């Protein structure tokens, strides 16, 4: 069996992410969940917070290890960790088109590195970290869309923001 990485910003990690990661953990010897930084995104949680939340979520899965590599190319991280595959989740055709393009770049950088695409369940196909943040910003309840530690952290962020406005 080979090792794989599942890179993402995970701001925050959602039930859709968890579903894909849990499924992929059964396919590989080791799955590294890699907290990365996307320079085009504005983050709600710090890198350290995202790392801690993801570690809490997967603390009982010995095949999953959560690490942070904020300023590296995905291909470089895969090389460092001895991973032969990159796992990505798909919700819809827009995700497919985006992931196909990224997989093409990664394949150009390393012809031996494969991308494995896993679909989320249809009932989770609408969940995105951006949608979660937007819903929380306006006071909506997302507790059924994210793991419990994430729901608690989102509630705390919202409470702190509301206290700052007073």
Curated annotation (Swiss-Prot):
Claim: Acetylation is one of the keywords in the record = no
Look up the EC number in the record and give it: 2.7.7.3
* GO annotation, biological process: coenzyme A biosynthetic process
Give the top-level enzyme category. transferase
Q: Which InterPro entries does the entry mention?
A: Cyt_trans-like, PPAT, Rossmann-like_a/b/a_fold
- Cofactors named for this entry: Mg(2+)
Q: Which UniProt keywords apply?
A: ATP-binding, Coenzyme A biosynthesis, Cytoplasm, Magnesium, Nucleotide-binding, Nucleotidyltransferase, Transferase
Annotated S-S bridges? none
Kindly list any coiled-coil regions of this protein.
none
- Which pathway does the UniProt entry assign to this protein? Cofactor biosynthesis; coenzyme A biosynthesis; CoA from (R)-pantothenate: step 4/5
Reaction it catalyzes: (R)-4'-phosphopantetheine + ATP + H(+) = 3'-dephospho-CoA + diphosphate
Q: How does it assemble?
A: Homohexamer.
Its family remark reads: Belongs to the bacterial CoaD family.
According to UniProt, the name of this protein is Phosphopantetheine adenylyltransferase
Q: Which organism is it from?
A: Lactobacillus johnsonii (strain CNCM I-12250 / La1 / NCC 533)
């Amino acid at each position: 069996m080979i090792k794989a990485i599942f890179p993402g910003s995970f701001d925050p990690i959602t039930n859709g992410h968890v579903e894909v990661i849990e499924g992929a953990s059964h396919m590989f010897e080791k799955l590294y969940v890699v907290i990365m930084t996307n320079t085009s995104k504005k983050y709600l949680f710090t890198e350290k917070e995202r790392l801690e939340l993801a570690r809490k979520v997967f603390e009982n899965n010995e095949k999953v290890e959560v690490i942070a590599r904020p300023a590296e190319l995905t291909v470089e991280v895969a090389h460092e960790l001895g991973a032969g595959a990159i796992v990505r989740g798909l919700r819809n055709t827009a995700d497919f088109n985006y992931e196909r393009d990224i997989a093409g770049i990664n394949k150009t950088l390393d012809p031996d590195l494969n991308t494995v695409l896993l679909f989320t369940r249809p009932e989770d196909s609408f969940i995105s970290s951006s949608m979660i943040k937007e819903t929380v910003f306006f006071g909506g309840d997302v507790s059924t869309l994210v793991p419990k530690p994430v729901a608690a952290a989102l509630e705390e962020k919202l409470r702190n923001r509301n206290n700052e406005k007073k």
